[in-house]
Amino acid sequence: MNISKRFVLASLAALSGTTGLAGMASAEEINIILCGDVVTPVYTKLFEEWNAANPDYPVAPELVGWGQCQDKVTTLAVAGTPVDIAYVGSRTLKQFALNDLIVPVPMSDEEKAGYYNFVPETVTFDGQQWGIPVAFSTKAFFWNKDLFEQAGLDPETPPRTWEEQQAFAKQISENTDAAGFGMIAKTFDGTVHWFLHWIYTNNGQVIDADGNIVLNSPQNLAALTAFKDIVPYSEEGPTAYEQNEVRAIWLDEGLAMMHCSVSCANRGTEAGINWGVAPLPVGPDAQGPGTLLITDSLAVFKGTGQEDKVIEFGKFLTSPENQLAYELSEGGLTPLRPSPEVDAMIAEKPHWQPFVDGIEFGGPEPLLTDYVGFQNVMIEMVQSVVTGAAEPQAALEKAAAELEQYK
């Protein structure tokens, strides 16, 4: 094994903590690791359907808590005792693939065309797909209409640009007891996701289609500068807050504006907030509304001896009809594919519209050789600017240079 491969495998193993090892999957079963504490009713029904049609390959699900799920999957794969198929963050696929731990899951052109823009790209590198998208998350802009009104702003008019967002945040901070804007900058993966939303609302990129690191660009400098400029009008000490903690402040009406998933709609209503939702404000180079496009995927692991049948099972679970049933049952997942049923859902619940509108000009979560390394570099960059330890240009240059080792 060469040095670079040992290093990356060590990085993968470091993710795994002290999770115990399980035995190799038996040939007659399809072992699947799902994250959470319950098998959803939709999956229970689909497993029963599969078992009836494929009695020689019954499904054996294993539930692992969200905090340990990725770690256990990684531990089993690195140890050479892989599960057949597992729920993973798509950001890990490149690292798994380069270490020969998973197999490609090719998509036909017809399959690719069935998804929203860029969804296949979240699982693709070197021209191959390495996972099957199974969950999709996008973000939109939420605001507290009552706090807008208290600050002298039109409660029905959200900011459309970064410039307006900062001006509104300043006006709210100066005229109410609330912070203007909710900023996420804690040492947590959500900080990376959150800044990527800024990159993708200004036509920026981290790594291009040819595998070049392009973080140090005018578009991303504008994003990091706008990020810095809104700090004075955000909650105090943003490096102490991750997204759920910022959401809690918003729900307590301690801040007026934040970027959030669709979950903020129901939570806001339950909290009695007079809220609105719109596409994320955009930067000067934006071509339209954008957002980070995050997917989780089903990865098929190498070495089980039944990879082809497992791929068939994964595609059964995520067929358009079955995937839509899963998404609608979960309630907080952005649909992976457009359909008449999705159109009907948006017509019934118009607050979904911004979460779909941002897809067209959004961008996928970057696939790098060491996602933890990437995450650490990005968090350090963001925090150095938020705290004033570095200026945006210097922080961007430093981060771009450090990312070269992970491309």
Region annotations inferred by a language model:
Residues S90-A140, Q166-F168, E174, W194, ...:
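Hinge/lid segment of periplasmic solute-binding proteins
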Residues V103-N117, P158, F181-A185, N202-A222, ...:
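Short, solvent-exposed loop/beta-turn-alpha elements that line the ligand-binding surface or hinge
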Residues W130-V134, K139, E164-N212, L255:
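Extracytoplasmic/periplasmic solute-binding protein
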Residues Q166-Q171, D210-T239:
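Glycine-centered hinge/linker elements that transmit conformational signals in sensory
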Residues P41, K94, V262-G276, G283-E380, ...:
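C-terminal lobe and pocket-closing loops
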Residues L46-F118, T124, Q150-G152, I249, ...:
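Extracytoplasmic "Venus flytrap"/periplasmic binding protein-like
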